[in-house]
């Protein structure tokens, strides 16, 4: 087979897990980048991620994008 046909392109997902830091209490927690429900801080209850039908809007600081 020619060189160009030997590669198989595998699509990669665009969604990731992210580690968010709460701006009020500094708690860090992991959430999904395309969250379908409101994500609240487990310590103080502040909204960290608001769903939009696609990628969530993050109110907290994104510390790390997990692979």
Swiss-Prot record:
Zn(2+) binds at residues 22, 25, 41, 44. Part of the 30S ribosomal subunit. GO terms for biological process: translation. Keywords: Metal-binding, Ribonucleoprotein, Ribosomal protein, Zinc, Zinc-finger. This is Small ribosomal subunit protein eS27. It comes from the Archaea. SUPFAM superfamilies: Zn-binding ribosomal proteins (SSF57829). NCBIfam families: PRK00415.1. A zinc finger (C4-type) spans 22-44. One of its GO terms (cellular component) is ribosome. Belongs to the eukaryotic ribosomal protein eS27 family. One of its GO terms (molecular function) is zinc ion binding. It comes from Pyrobaculum calidifontis (strain DSM 21063 / JCM 11548 / VA1).
């Amino acid at each position: 087979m020619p060189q160009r046909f030997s590669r198989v392109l595998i699509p990669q997902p665009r969604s990731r897990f992210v580690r968010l830091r709460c701006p009020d209490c500094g708690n860090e927690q992991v959430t999904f980048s395309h969250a379908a429900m409101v994500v609240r801080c487990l310590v103080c209850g502040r909204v960290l991620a608001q769903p939009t039908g696609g990628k969530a809007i993050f109110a907290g600081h994104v510390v790390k994008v997990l692979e």
